[in-house]
Amino acid sequence: MRIGLAGIFVDDQDRAERFYTEVLGLQVKTNAAYGPGERWLTVMSPEEPDGVELVLHLTDEPARAFRRASRELGRPVFSLRTDDCQRDADRLKAKGVGFVREPARMPYGGMDAVFDDTCGNLVNLHQD
């Protein structure tokens, strides 16, 4: 077995699609109607075409409460791996991305930085 899909909740699927593709450089894998006013929207890394797809779900009220609590605790909803955390943080900052935690060595190993995805989530940038 392997993980095929993971999902996060976003306030606006159009804005999320722009952020995750134009800013982060991911690619849309699936974009299909999925219920009233919602799409089944997945993005994936162009470096791993058979890798995990990230589903960008439209937020509902229970998800809003979970996201608020996660943000208040400073907990990212997922991590993106990089081979150079500082370089990618600088690149994202140049594109206007706001960081809530600058790149720093972590006690468990590697380097992490945390940024706001503009769609209600914190995302971790991790370097081994």
What are these regions (language model features)?
Residues M1-R2, S70-R75, P107:
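Short glycine-enriched loop/turn motifs at secondary-structure junctions
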Residues I8-V52:
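Core segments of cupin and vicinal oxygen chelate
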Residues D12-Q13, D83-C85:
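Helix N-cap motif at beta-to-alpha junctions
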Residues E38-R39, P62-R67, R101:
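A short, acidic/glycine-rich surface segment
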